[in-house]
Design a protein with these regions (language model features):
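Hydrophobic/aromatic-rich transmembrane helices and adjacent perimembrane loops
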Residues: 1, 29-30, 37-61, 217
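Hydrophobic, aromatic-rich transmembrane alpha-helices
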Residues: 1-13
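Transmembrane alpha-helix segments characteristic
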Residues: 11-32, 196-205
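Membrane-interfacial entry segments at the cytosolic side of transmembrane helices
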Residues: 12-17, 61-76
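Transmembrane alpha-helical segments
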Residues: 33, 57, 71-113
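C-terminal luminal/periplasmic domains and tails of membrane-associated envelope-modifying transferases
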Residues: 98-319
Length: 319
């Protein structure tokens, strides 16, 4: 409605419109180009200008005809009802034209949809159903502790747990229920396709959705890449402790589980190199390089230079 009012020049206040629109455009351009594009919270200031502009347009319409008061009133009531139905998980709020809060994670992630705020509701859900054996892929794992909320689930590895070096053992197959935070289900952390150890769940219909942010899946699931990632972490920790033979066993097991994983090939190559086997390490590095060239360009930028540097170091050492 506001755009229509401005386009038809019913709101004939050029200076006031510029005063409200220019800051919005400038702020959005800066916010979207500085490399800190991680959440709508960084652009909340633009809403102040937009709401004033919307209020001005509504005032013009109502002044022209009282019928517009009913239209504006209905739109406000719809917005209030939409917001109330999202309670208590306002972080994931999206209106129904967008698809509602349970669809937000498909388009936005992190603080736009899920910051791990559903633990109390997850605890109640499991308690009401008497669930004692489950798995939880929790966005804030390693930072917040689900067990404090009475959640008995075993954890699944996330980027955060790997970064914090939280040891997690994952078998090749697991029995549900499996609970997955929206930010993890989106796949934004590990990457798309073959990089995502939990990609299969995107194709499945959840049994339930808790607070628009935790998806519940029942059944038995094969988890080779997640299991391999947990073994890679264990292998690297053992290598740091100079337990190279055990580290080698874990790395080989990781490759056996997920031979088409860049992570597993690099881990095995690194450990072989540390054990004084550069030729064998080269084989794994070259396989990792081959795999890296098949992923999306955005993720190639992260992987290729690192792998190429390893291979270059090998060539330098051999001269």
């Amino acid at each position: 409605l506001t755009i229509g009012v401005i386009a038809t020049r019913r709101l004939n206040r050029r200076r006031e419109i510029l005063f409200l629109v220019v800051p919005v455009i400038f702020y959005l351009v800066v916010a979207l180009t500085v490399g800190m594009n991680i959440g709508v919270r960084h652009i909340l200031v633009v809403y102040v200008f937009l709401y004033v502009l919307i209020g001005g347009a509504a005032s013009i319409l109502i002044g022209k005809s009282r019928k517009w008061a009913y239209v504006v009133g209905v739109l406000l009531l719809v917005h209030v009802a939409s917001s109330a139905l999202t309670f208590p998980n306002y972080i994931a709020y999206a209106n129904e034209l967008w698809g509602g809060p349970s669809q937000t994670y498909k388009y936005l992630t992190d603080s736009n949809a899920d910051w791990g705020q559903q633990l109390k509701s997850v605890g109640r859900y499991l308690d009401q159903r008497g669930v004692k054996d489950c798995w939880f892929l929790y966005f804030a794992e390693g930072v917040a502790e689900p067990s404090y909320y009475g959640i008995p689930c075993k954890p699944l590895p996330t980027i955060s747990t790997l970064w914090l070096n939280v040891p997690i053992d994952v078998p090749n197959s697991i029995d549900g229920p499996v609970l997955i935070s929206a930010s993890n289900l989106s796949g934004v952390e590990f990457g798309p396709g073959s990089l995502d150890p939990y990609g299969q769940f995107k194709l499945l219909k959840p049994t339930a959705v808790i607070d628009h942010g935790v998806f519940v899946f029942d059944g038995k699931f094969e988890m080779p890449l997640a299991a391999a990632i947990s073994k890679v972490q264990k292998a690297r920790n053992l290598a740091q402790e100079k337990q190279l033979e055990r580290a080698l066993q874990e790395a080989k097991a990781a490759v056996a589980l997920a031979p088409d994983s860049i992570q597993t090939q690099l881990a095995l190559g690194d450990i072989l190199l540390e054990m004084g086997q550069p030729q064998q390490a080269r084989t794994n590095y070259e396989k990792a390089l081959e795999l890296a060239k098949t992923i999306e360009p955005e993720f190639q930028i992260r992987s290729l230079p690192d792998i190429e540097q390893r291979l270059q170091s090998l060539e330098t050492a051999e001269r």
